[in-house]
């Protein structure tokens, strides 16, 4: 933080570009940021201050009366540093989802990117990561206030939110697939709603299945964002091959889900976020 404070007086110029990347998680944001980070005139980061970001998700989702100015200052300073040293920056995080409009007003990015991944692959990935595993259903019935879902680190404990108020007990009765699908659908809906409210900024939808291993897409990005020293197709694929953090559990694919899990999955999507198929990658 002391290093960042050196850039407090920095002023963004016309040739500085700042992208804010939003997503529900498991949607390729880390890889997307690495594409930018592969060029000398850009720096790309994802989950840069993960504990603070997870706390931001927690207090934003539960609408807790906690002043967020310190969080906004941290990211403004980080952005200033990036722009001063590298000219352009993309800051990505799945933890920004419940405060998009607020972040936009405070940080003033030049571009907003909404990273998405199809719901089946997303839920499979969250499941493999251990989301809502060993959740104490009986202990948590009828709770009226936000809880901490204890995990092996603070970031996960704060970020694995659960619904509050009247839907909570119904959510507890769902399978893990149902619980995870609620999270995916609800988080994307929050981003989608704020994304559509925001005007006078360049906004892009990016679907992972449209851009994954797509070098033509990279070439379009290279032009749009003025990448210096474009990378080769082989270098581009090497970025993809370094995707981290797949999760400790075995795969549990849609074809193996039982009928209850599939019913809950489709019900949650139809009820909360039925827009995915109609969204088009527009970069």
Name every feature range the model reports, one short phrase each.
Residues 82-102:
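Glycine-rich phosphate-binding loop used to anchor ATP phosphates in small-molecule kinases
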Residues 29-33, 51-54, 97-100, 120-125, ...:
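Short catalytic/ligand-binding loop motif for oxyanion handling, primarily in non-cytosolic enzymes
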Residues 1-84, 132, 243, 247-248:
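PAPS-dependent sulfotransferase catalytic core
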Residues 28-42, 103, 107, 127, ...:
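PAPS/PAP-binding and catalytic site of the sulfotransferase fold
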Residues 129-173:
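Acidic/polar short surface loop at catalytic or gating sites that assists cofactor/ion binding
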Residues 106-127:
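Conserved phosphate-donor/acceptor-positioning beta-strand/loop module used by diverse small-molecule
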Residues 22-24, 90-95, 115-117, 207-209:
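Short His-Asn-centered micro-motif
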Residues 1-15, 154-205, 210-283:
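PAPS-dependent sulfotransferases, especially Golgi type II membrane carbohydrate sulfotransferases
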